[in-house]
Amino acid sequence: MISLRRTARNILIVGSSHISVWVATFAFTVVQARYLDPSRFGQLALALAYAAFLLIFVDFGTSTLVSRTVAQRRDEQRSVIAATLLIRSVLWLVALPFLLLVSLVLGYDADLVRAILVLAIATLFVSWGGAVTAYLLGREEFLLPSLSMSAYRIVAAIVGIAILVLVPTPSLYLIACAFLIGAMVSAGLLFYALRGQTAIAWQIEPRRAVALLRSALPIGAYLVVGTFYFNVDLVMLEGMAPAENVGWYAAAYRLFKNATLVEAIVVARVLYPVFSRMSLGPQEELRVVIAKAMSFLAILGAAVVLLFVLCADGIVGILYSTDAYAPTANALRLLAPGLFFLYLNSVVCNALFALGYEKRLLVMAAVFAVLNVSANLLAIPRFMEDGAAAVTTLTEVGLLLWLTRLAPRDLLTGETARTVAKAGAAAVIAGVMVVLSGANTLLAMVPLALLAYGVAIVALRTIGPADLASIADLFGAGRPRRPATVPLGQPVHEEIAKSS
């Protein structure tokens, strides 16, 4: 199927271009943990959580709506970027005083408040760049958004690492400046590349902006509520536990978030515009793409969970400091299964957004916001960071159950459910084999776990012959193809040269 092959190739190439982003993010996180004690590391994570929530509020669903609208009716959206920029600028100006007021009311120290302010300014630049990115992704143009995201993460990492290494006891405010510089470079790259584009109308049309915001309201409300219950645990932990516990949980959660990069590339970057385009036609091709995406992410997600659960102590010891961050390992083990369900949830949720299910998804998010906060109120006082981690995983399980009930009956197939179950079973089998082997070092556990997992995947026939043939074709093992050229700045379907 041509669209499936194109989608798989786009995922591969966009994913390859984001390896540098992953490396830069991990390196910056490791250096932060090495040069900051757990309490200050936790404060920085808290500031980043506020910035993430602000970004979602400023976006307010416009990225999702713009990508979907452009994918479905691309020739009618010349002024959509200007309208999106106006919406985001106004929402940022409205939200900033409330953000600073909350910081002062909660009694944060001056350094943390300044860091939150700097990250808020960085968020404005990220949101401006995101407006352009949403438009380009809707056109299935991936080169420029990938370069922009890489520039943001790499520049922020380089500047941040330099500050941490060269400045004795750097302030959180100074570290936050690294993110601001990266955001400015990223946004500047996008707007410079689009200068002189006649296909884009830059004049401000307030009525168009109001209409766009009105259409985005259900999506924006969903994203705000969803971001709330995925970041509120860190805020609650900061108010209910010692600073060290906040740092331990933040360290585990940063690894958890970094591991979602694959999901962000596969689904948010590549698949969502495809889902939106396919939603206008027959459901068969959409169903096939969803099935293949869920199978791929289930197999990959189970492998990540396997390594995190088995190797948590070793990972924490290498990336952080065993003495200062030892409790992080158990929190990471409790968070890890949530990745498996998060990968699956992302596919179903984005498909439902493409089909226009945002109002039903908002109801789901509101219910889980109440459940998540209630569960954290019970778990954090008794289990601290471990309780917050367990609640995160249980939330993902509940979301998957709700989403599968919400999706149309013909959208998810029994074959996909069997593949997901087999991937989970293969991870359990591999984990038991590694434990029984007595291996206790990363050098021994990682290859043994992956080998055992691969054998179990094959033995359980998790991947069928047709899938293996598709993978072989994807990597060029099939019949030779004539190389294709990719015109810069044009819609790309055959070949391809992703926020705090």
Task: State the predicted function of each range.
Residues 25, 58-75, 138, 252, ...:
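Helix-loop junctions and terminal segments of transmembrane helices
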Residues 1-24, 75-78, 82, 111-112, ...:
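N-terminal membrane topogenesis motif
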Residues 33-41, 110-113, 117, 139-147, ...:
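Membrane-interface helix-loop junctions in multi-pass transport and translocation proteins
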Residues 23, 368-371, 416-470, 487-489, ...:
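Transmembrane alpha-helical segments of multi-pass transport proteins
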Residues 88-225, 230-231:
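Hydrophobic transmembrane helix module of multi-pass membrane transport proteins
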Residues 1-7, 172-178, 188-230, 270, ...:
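Interhelical loop/hinge segments that connect adjacent transmembrane helices in multipass membrane
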Residues 103-119, 308-340:
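Interfacial segments at transmembrane-helix termini and the short loops linking adjacent helices
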